[in-house]
């Protein structure tokens, strides 16, 4: 049984380690693999997905691989047009009726074939992933990435019932999408609520906690694989996420994990959440920060080391490798 799975169920002898966006532009090998392919073509190429996913374990020696895909892949199931130019560009109107595919195995065949290939080649667990409902709704309503989500917030305030209905539809589709990934061979699930920091605290429970609770409940009725929830938020809202039913909670770098372990009687399995900007430092300085960060967390029995957001494109590969080496040398016994 792998370290990643162990930390969610039994104890591990050291903190398992993997990273958000652990494969990406910071890797010369990834840039060579992608070559001149467009991002959309790359994300729909079974062989490319397979080889890119394998770069994480092979180059970093991490304890888990996360499927190399994009959160917008879910939109294939709605037949919504999107592209990367270079950022996400989505053609969607809130007036459109969302109808999800009745043949997900065919719609996502490029992805499911990659998962089946990977399971044969990996010696670590493969993590399936998808966006949580609020984050996917933000992409749809903004037509792509956004800093302040003005269209989303305006729609949310003007049409709260319609926004609730949109979140419900997205959650139901995400259950189908992730269930197919698990049935193809993935052994764990990572949910990404990466747009949630924009919400006022008073709206967090309605638009983040409740939809994720519904999503996780439906997932647990369909699959037995462990579920981790990544969420961008502050400490006060993070505590609210304990009611979602996620097996592991993964805050971004705004949350002080050490304080969570102190404040919560039964903190359960936590994952994260070192600031990815620290990886940009000269290696000796970075490792000093890492040792301080781990001084308390490494002793927590259900702790998984990870980044508090995706690894940045400017990151030296050697620093990520050094972080893994530091983690794998830890003994908590």
Swiss-Prot record:
It is found in: Cytoplasm. Pathway: Porphyrin-containing compound metabolism; protoporphyrin-IX biosynthesis; coproporphyrinogen-III from 5-aminolevulinate: step 4/4. One of its GO terms (molecular function) is uroporphyrinogen decarboxylase activity. Substrate binds at residues 21-25, 70, 139, 194, 309. One of its GO terms (cellular component) is cytosol. It catalyses: uroporphyrinogen III + 4 H(+) = coproporphyrinogen III + 4 CO2. CDD domains: URO-D. InterPro entries: UROD/MetE-like_sf, Uroporphyrinogen_deCO2ase_HemE, Uroporphyrinogen_deCOase. GO terms for biological process: protoporphyrinogen IX biosynthetic process. Keywords: Cytoplasm, Decarboxylase, Lyase, Porphyrin biosynthesis. The record marks 70 as: Transition state stabilizer. The keyword Cytoplasm applies. Its EC number is 4.1.1.37. HAMAP family: URO_D (MF_00218). Belongs to the uroporphyrinogen decarboxylase family. Catalyzes the decarboxylation of four acetate groups of uroporphyrinogen-III to yield coproporphyrinogen-III. Homodimer. This is Uroporphyrinogen decarboxylase. It comes from Chlamydia abortus (strain DSM 27085 / S26/3). The gene is hemE.
